[in-house]
Structure formats: structure tokens, C-alpha cells
């Protein structure tokens, strides 16, 4: 019986360990596009900290600092884009949520940015 328990423990999936940050991988927000659109927010963060942030409507550069499980986003001003009021509000909310992110974790292909509003992103498969 003890041998079976040891074998089971050895073959069971390990608890999710913090892996390496997925630099240079496109990450798509784990939400459906808004009605009438195919777009969802996308993050692409380089190992040098330079990032491209595509929100619901606007896009622009950012600087991202990653140290262990800590992360900090500094978004540059983004040019206005013609959008519906709903998308403009969603952009403002997403930018505010990214500015408040303090940590991250990865489980499989899901990267969770942790702050007052957790944000789940899926690694792109293309």
C-alpha cells in the first residue's frame, strides 16, 4: 500500500511551478471579442522590457519590468483611435488594470497578471 502511494505521488502532476516569463510570445486576453469585432487585447513583451499593447481599440508601446514573479507595466500615451464609447471605456479600464498589476503566474498556456483586477491571457498558438 505504501509503495502504491509513493508511486502515485511520483506520477501525479506536480503543483504548478512558476516558470519563466513568456517573453516574445503574443498573449491574448482570455475574453470574447466585443460584438461586431474580432479584436481582443494583446500583449507582446520582449525580453528587453519593450512591449506592444493592443487594447480593445487603441494600441501603443509600454515598458514592462519582470523580476521573478513581480511585474510592472508603464504604458506610454496611446494615440486616440475612432472607437465606440464602450470600447473607449474598456481601453481606459484595461490600461488602469495593467498599471495596477504587481505579479504574474503561468499555468499551462495561461498567464495571469495579478492585481486588484486579475487579467488572464492565453499564449498565442500561431
Can you annotate each of these PLM segments?
Residues 2-10:
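Bacterial N-terminal signal peptides
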Residues 9-126:
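Lipid interaction determinants
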